[in-house]
Each structure stands twice: as C-alpha cells, then as structure tokens.
Regions:
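Aromatic-glycine hotspot motif
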Residues: 1-61, 73-142
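Histidine-centered divalent metal-coordination motifs
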Residues: 67
Length: 142
C-alpha cells in the first residue's frame, strides 16, 4: 500500500496535509526508512535543544518526540481494529491533554529514542502481519 493509492473518501480531509508529505514508499519500506531517518536526526540533536520551545504555549522538542510515539501507538491500535473488521466508531484523543501528563521533559533523549524505536518496530510487525485485504479495510475514528 502506498499513499498514492488512497482515495480521498478513505480519510478525513484533516489528514491530507500529512498524506501529501509522505513519500510514496510502500508501507513497510516507508516505516523502516522513516525510522532510520528519524533516529539519525534525533541522535544529532544537542541535548540543550531538547527542551527548547519557541513560544510559551508550544511543545518542546522532547514533547514533540513523545507526541510522535503516542500518535503512532494510537494509530497502530486503530489499524489493528480496522484490520480485524471492527466497524465501531473509535474515540478520538486530545494530544494537547496528553502532553502535560507525558512528563516528556523529564526523560532522557536515549529513553525517548528507545521508546520511539520500539513503537515503530512494533508498528512494522503489526503491518507485516496484515494481508492486503486487511490493509484496505476502512474504519471510523474521531
């Protein structure tokens, strides 16, 4: 499955910005490639920049990393439910509510990178387990 194979009826308009930014890899190669690039990028960041925030109501770099982890976990769970044929409307989540309780700024860069890597590898394993028919299942989520 590639981003270019998606029809606009298969996702909410909100996600089009993100889908358009995705390179047109097949899913497995895209997940692995972005894992490698993201880890290289995160490892290159100086520690003194990880708690940088450009405005008082914005997230730090650590909080952004934690958001990536949390969002991938939520979306992988949704994908599993859709692949299994779940037709229930899945609840949304408020990433802005998650951020303060994530305590991301108390974590080390290594801890965040480790969790990101583990979550991405888990997502890759999950998507590897899906057949093509499972990958094209459509579900509802707020």
């Amino acid at each position: 499955m590639k981003a270019s194979e998606l029809s606009k009826e298969e996702f909410k308009p909100y996600f089009l910005t993100y889908i358009n930014k995705a390179l047109d890899f097949d899913l497995k190669n895209g997940l692995q490639s972005s894992l490698n690039h993201t880890i290289s990028f995160l490892e290159s960041l100086p520690d003194d920049k990880l708690e940088y925030v450009y405005a008082s109501d914005k997230w730090t770099v650590k909080e952004i990393i934690q958001h990536l982890i949390d969002a991938e976990r939520v979306f992988a769970y949704r994908a599993m439910r859709f692949a299994r044929g779940d037709k229930n409307n899945l609840p949304g989540y408020d990433e802005n509510q998650y951020t303060p309780s994530s305590i991301a700024n108390r974590r080390s860069k290594e801890s965040l990178i480790n969790e990101y890597t583990n979550q991405r590898q888990s997502s890759i394993s999950l998507f590897d387990s899906f057949t093509n028919d499972m990958l094209i299942q459509i579900g509802l989520a707020d």
